[in-house]
């Protein structure tokens, strides 16, 4: 039985913000233009890419890289705006723990809540530990991770949610190393 199975049976209080707070963050003209060009058999019945060979497909994928590389900065900008609106801190990576931590965990998802409590307990005993929470995984942006990592870190444990038999490491671990 995994954590997901445990969490799906829990009840938690959630504070939901009024969507009116976020209206200024949305470019409605761009959203409408996007909706008009998406594949929808009812409103925009078209076929795309049905005759691409490998070389053309690869060129198209490579052309996207320029735009894909811009995503972390755009997401970080919007996270900052949402932080201002809500009064909560949002960022691609956040750090919790001792400012002079020597050992840290890097993780994402539900395990971070348990790790948070463990870090509190270890820091109460005088240990220099911390955790980096991953909030933006793809595209992975190490520059944002390094911004929050204490310069005193000597050891890193990566807790991944995936187990890939036969692999030299799991996806998050491979991104970190």
PLM feature spans:
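Conformationally flexible catalytic loops at phosphate/diphosphate-handling active centers
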Residues: 5-95
């Amino acid at each position: 039985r995994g954590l997901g199975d445990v969490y799906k049976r829990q009840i938690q209080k959630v504070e939901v913000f009024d969507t009116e707070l976020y209206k200024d963050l949305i470019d409605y003209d761009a959203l409408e233009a996007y909706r008009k060009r998406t594949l929808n058999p009812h409103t925009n019945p078209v076929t795309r890419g049905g005759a691409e060979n490998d070389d053309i497909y690869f060129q198209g994928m490579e052309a996207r890289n320029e735009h894909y590389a811009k995503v972390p900065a755009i997401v970080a900008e919007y996270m900052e705006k949402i932080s201002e609106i809500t009064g909560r801190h949002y960022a691609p990576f956040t750090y919790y723990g001792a400012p002079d931590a020597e050992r840290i965990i890097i993780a994402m998802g539900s395990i971070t809540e348990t790790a948070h409590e463990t870090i509190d307990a270890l820091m109460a005993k005088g240990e220099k530990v911390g955790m980096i929470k991953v909030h933006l995984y793809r595209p992975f942006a190490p520059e944002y991770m390094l911004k929050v990592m204490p310069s005193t870190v000597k050891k890193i444990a990566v807790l991944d949610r995936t187990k890939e038999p036969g692999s030299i490491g799991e996806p998050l671990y491979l991104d970190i190393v």
